[in-house]
């Protein structure tokens, strides 16, 4: 690798010096002055011998700096590579200055600042010219580079001053037509403060835009009328077309024919003329669509309306209607339908006679058998049976006391056989519940002597009675339970079937005591 000259080393940037130091094998993480010194010593070791008091900058530069500090008031710091690009440039726009201060600045103040800036630039130019005169001829390369940088800085300064002068002239000069200056226009306008809008006015404006209800209803009615009129027109047209088709298809003879009823069995058939009733002529055949549309659902096509809808409640006694066969009324007796769920037996109405049954006891009779109608009055049941004794008439039976209940043991059956023959008698036990009237339902007064004379239904207790609820039978049970828990606290005692059985017995005993206490009128705790 070729060794760079001293001027080249001084002209290199800091990053390039670091790369060079790395390639050579020197430490690159140093300051710019020290790094340049190390590189010079590495490439030119004789420079160290010639100038033993070399401190990171040449003696010539030190003397130059001393002379310049003596001659000038403001010292110029000489640095080789430490300056970054753009450090020396001043910003074109000063963002830190607030707008209010800029607005408050008058036109005269702007002109004074411009004059002071021009003086400063002239002073800098003079200093630079002096520096050129003082600088020795040995450092030509450095001065060339400095002069280049100074020329560029001069050009930048001139450009900035020209721009500022233009701005100042724009502000001072009267605004041209259509061009308002940047900040003068804002000064004239007051700052708009955020204020709440007047909602009342806004609502009124919206309400005025809205349509009134009357207008809306009129518009709606018109729309409905137009739609409904078109629909009605279509309906009328379809009806007319259907009627025309029917008139064309059906002849006059078919139209005048009567409609047959569904129940043709009850009414006589009219004489059929022409085609058979089973077949329909071709001109009468229509699709189901037209027939369903033309005929109403509620229209009843059959002329016959039956008066009797169910046969369960039909009157079968034709003799009442005709009023003939009155002498046969006793023979023709059809029983009226009664529900078997309710049975009312009064002392006036007696049960029915049993049919003659030899050597057989009757089975349990249903309630419907015992139902007696006032029309059909059976033979009376008598308490005793005696031959050739006159029977009691229904009138006499009615005269008997209502409070007395009949408890017959036997039933006499009147038969058509002669009287000299014996009649088979079957015992009958009356099990039906008689409805008690308010007269029979009256309770008599309690007779103490009669109740004491009656034998007891239970065996009375003999001896001294225990105090009620005072003694506890199962006192030791709780202690045992506690002892069990103490002994087996690691494994708790699980409830077994025996325990459940004992608990159940105890509950039953408690219920029994409670019922006995309530029956005897003792207050149960």
UniProtKB/Swiss-Prot annotation:
This protein's encoding gene: nusap1-c
Ranges of compositional bias, category Basic and acidic residues: 93-102, 160-169, 495-514
GO molecular function annotation: DNA binding; microtubule binding
Protein name in UniProt: Nucleolar and spindle-associated protein 1-C
Ranges annotated as spanning the membrane: none
Organism: Xenopus laevis (African clawed frog)
Localization per record: Cytoplasm; Nucleus; Cytoplasm, Cytoskeleton, Spindle
Similarity remark: Belongs to the NUSAP family.
Cell wall biogenesis/degradation is among the record's keywords: no
Main location: cytoplasm
Nucleus in keyword set: yes
């Amino acid at each position: 690798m070729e060794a760079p000259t001293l001027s080249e080393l001084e002209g290199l940037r800091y990053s390039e010096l670091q790369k060079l130091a790395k390639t050579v094998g020197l430490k690159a993480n140093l300051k710019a002055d020290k790094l340049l010194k190390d590189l010079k010593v590495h490439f030119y070791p004789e420079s160290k011998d010639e100038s033993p008091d070399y401190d990171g900058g040449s003696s010539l530069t030190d003397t130059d700096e001393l002379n310049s500090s003596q001659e000038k008031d403001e010292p110029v710091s000489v640095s080789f590579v430490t300056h970054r690009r753009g450090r020396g440039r001043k910003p074109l726009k000063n963002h830190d200055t607030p707008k209010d201060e800029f607005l408050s600045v008058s036109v005269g103040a702007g002109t004074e600042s411009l004059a002071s800036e021009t003086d400063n630039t002239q002073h800098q130019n003079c200093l630079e010219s002096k520096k050129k005169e003082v600088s020795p001829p040995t450092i030509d390369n450095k001065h060339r580079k400095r002069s280049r940088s100074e020329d560029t800085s001069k050009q930048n300064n001139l450009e900035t001053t020209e721009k500022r002068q233009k701005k100042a002239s724009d502000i001072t000069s009267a605004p041209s037509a259509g061009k308002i200056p940047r900040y003068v226009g804002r000064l004239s306008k007051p700052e708009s403060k955020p204020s709440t809008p007047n909602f009342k006015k806004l609502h009124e404006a919206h309400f005025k835009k809205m349509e009134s209800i009357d207008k809306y209803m009129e518009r709606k009615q018109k729309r409905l009328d137009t739609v409904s009129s078109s629909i009605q027109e279509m309906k009328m047209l379809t009806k007319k077309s259907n009627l025309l088709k029917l008139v064309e298809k059906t002849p006059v003879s078919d139209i005048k024919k009567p409609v047959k009823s569904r129940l043709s069995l009850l009414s006589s058939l009219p004489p059929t003329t022409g085609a058979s009733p089973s077949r329909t002529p071709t001109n009468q055949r229509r699709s189901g669509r037209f027939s369903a549309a033309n005929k109403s659902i509620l229209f009843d096509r059959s002329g016959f309306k039956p008066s009797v809808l169910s046969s369960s409640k039909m009157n079968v006694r034709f003799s009442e209607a005709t009023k003939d066969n009155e002498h046969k009324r006793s023979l023709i007796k059809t029983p009226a339908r009664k529900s078997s769920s309710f049975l009312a037996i009064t002392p006036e109405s007696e049960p029915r006679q049993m049919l003659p049954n030899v050597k057989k006891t009757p089975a349990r009779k249903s309630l419907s058998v015992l139902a007696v109608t006032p029309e059909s009055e059976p033979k009376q049941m008598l308490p005793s049976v005696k031959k050739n004794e006159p029977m009691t008439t229904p009138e006499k039976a009615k005269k008997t006391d209502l409070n007395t209940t009949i408890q017959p043991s036997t039933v006499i059956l009147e038969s058509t056989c002669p009287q000299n023959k014996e009649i088979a008698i079957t015992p009958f036990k009356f099990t039906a519940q008689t409805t008690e009237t308010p007269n029979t339902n009256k309770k008599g007064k309690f007779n103490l002597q009669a109740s004491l004379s009656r034998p007891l239904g239970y065996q009375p207790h003999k001896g001294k009675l225990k105090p009620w609820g005072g003694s506890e039978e199962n006192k030791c049970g709780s202690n045992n339970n506690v002892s069990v828990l103490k002994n087996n606290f690691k494994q708790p005692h699980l409830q077994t079937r025996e325990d459940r059985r004992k608990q159940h017995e105890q509950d039953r005993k408690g219920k029994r005591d409670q019922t006995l206490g309530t029956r005897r009128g003792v207050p149960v705790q």
